[in-house]
Amino acid sequence: MQSFLKSPIGVVLAAFLATLLVGLIVLRATGSSLGGLALGWGKAADTGTPSAPAPLVPDASGFNAARIIDDEVFYDSQAMTREEIAAFVARVNAGCQPGSDGTECLATATFSVQARPASTFCPGGIEAASGVSAADVIWEVSQACDINPQVLLVLIHKEQGLLTASGASLSARDYEAAAGYACPDHGACDPQWAGFPSQLYGAASQFHRYRLDPGSYDVVAQRPTRIAYSPDAQCGSGEVTVANQATAGLYNYTPFQPNEAAAHGGDQCTSWGNWNFYGYFKTLFGSPTSA
């Protein structure tokens, strides 16, 4: 055997085998598609970063603390059809991976919807149903409560990032507190309002409470009001005379305004809620205020 290896043929063969071995090692180490196809390593790509929806960047250019969104936009329940909502959710949520706890992505999740009788705040009422998609929940609530479905879409993203939540950033809590309604930041939601359908219905009905009984709330349209910059009282407040009911409702729902630092990346006193509502709405649907 040793004499064969020392012969010219043996040397050439040994060199060839060594070269082949090195090539195979390199192909496998680099995850080459050629290696995967030729050698059955088709799962090599599984070790890469899972795909995820494209991130949404809020466009807050033109933000006006006194006029975040026009009434005509906020209460336009016909802004999108059921089919348009479904197509929108499928598009922005494309690439989503289920959460590590098994939570389904927004585009594929389904929910049981509780019956809601017609009320002063949501005159349309809602019928009980099961296996309802997120898009259909949004449509049903928008029609029952006379609110723009775009507002609900922006709200669930501003509160929980649900339009693009994926993998490690997606959990059951995101649906439980989808709209931030009756849910303290660091505590459990009121069980009566926990869950995606109840969150949307509760938030939509609350915005009409603000509209129908404005004097019972802190921020009233056309009345000068000091609005805090942060939950930290040391960050101060600024006077705002909001232009319309929709903007007043947003401040009653999220009682902080962005400070000047928000336009430059923010600081320890920046509250992003209403800034992001405006910014995400503009990114996704165009300006929420007329020129």
Please identify what each model-predicted range represents:
Residues 150-153, 164-169, 216:
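Short, solvent-exposed secondary-structure capping/transition elements
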Residues 2-19, 23-92, 182-291:
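Non-catalytic cell-wall polysaccharide-engagement segments
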Residues 73-160:
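Export/targeting segments at the very N-terminus of extracytoplasmic proteins
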Residues 59-60, 133, 167:
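Residue-level detector of functional hotspots within protein domains
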Residues 103, 173, 221-222:
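Residue-level signal for alpha-helical context at structural boundaries
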Residues 122-125, 162-194:
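Substrate-binding clefts and substrate-entry loops adjacent to catalytic sites
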Residues 78, 127-135, 144-149, 171-174, ...:
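Solvent-exposed, acidic/flexible segments
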Residues 157-164, 208-212:
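Hydrophobic/aromatic-lined pockets within catalytic cores
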